[in-house]
Amino acid sequence: MSGVVADTSALLAALFAEPQRDAVLVALSEADPALLSSCCLLEATIVAQSRLGPEGPAELERLLEAFNVEIAAFTADHSAMACDAWRRFGKGRHPAALNILDCCSYALAQASRQPLLAVGQDFARTDIELVELIG
């Protein structure tokens, strides 16, 4: 597999042992590179601490290190792409109902021309290429 952009939903599915955990881990292990928006790192860290307590961020960091996930800085170009994604697919505007951080993942996938690794159906209602999760 080529590179992927990981959405927060995929990382949290792996971290919290949700049903698609194994498929997400396979996709991450095959990705070269696996990218994560710095905005989504913030979101994942907050959710990890909220759900797992003080050890949550360290567990997330171990997951990111184990799969060599690269943190991509969120740039002005990404911001413009994310705004466009919100106009086209945002919550209250489109059935995909992307939130702000979904739009950040969308923008990084678009900018890097990599498929998006996500769990759930929101992104399937957009035009972004998705990683097919098997298993």
Model-derived features with residue positions:
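Anion (oxyanion) recognition and catalysis
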Residues: 28, 65, 110
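A generic structural signal for short hydrophobic patches within well-formed alpha-helices
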Residues: 11-12, 41, 123-124
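Acidic, PIN/NYN-like endoribonuclease modules and their adjacent C-terminal/linker elements
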Residues: 106-135
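Short loop->beta-strand "edge-of-pocket" segments that line small-molecule binding or catalytic clefts
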Residues: 4, 33-35, 67-72, 115
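Active-site neighborhoods of divalent-metal-dependent phosphate/nucleic-acid chemistry enzymes
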Residues: 70-115
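Short, well-structured N-terminal submotif of metal-dependent ribonuclease cores
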Residues: 1-36, 49-62, 134
